[in-house]
Amino acid sequence: FFRLCDTGVVGLILGQVIGRWGNFMNREAFGEYTDNLFAMRLPIDAVRQHEITETMWAHVTEGVNYIQVHPTFLYESMWNLVLLCLLLLYWKHKKFEGEIAILYFGGYGLGRCMIEGLRTDQLLLPHTNLAVSQILAGILVVFAIVVEVSVRTKKTQV
């Protein structure tokens, strides 16, 4: 089962690398206004009006018909591509069956936790500013660390 999990996450993360580009095609899952190197311009009429924040509107000047935002789909796609490469490089050095899957969960959760903070369409816990996806991603990271440490500790005790 754990060998199957290791193999399955490789296909899963490759699907995520490719699938995030669907967010670009749909003009969704972007971040707040930015003027950094990776800033992406979206035509205002191609974006749902409720997704344009006050900060974005503040940077729209007369005669300009676009918003300039963080391309969070690109950040996540690139993060997942790097994670995929690292997992494939580590494959021959794994210490136990299922370790690649655990490392994927931890790495994906870490990236998602950071990138999700840039997005403007977050689902927040009621009466808080906490994004549900960031909390779940954080739990995934903690879970991965606990499992990795506990399995390695048990292996060294044998």
Model-derived features: positions:
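A feature for loop-to-transmembrane-helix boundaries and adjacent hydrophobic helices
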Residues: 1-158
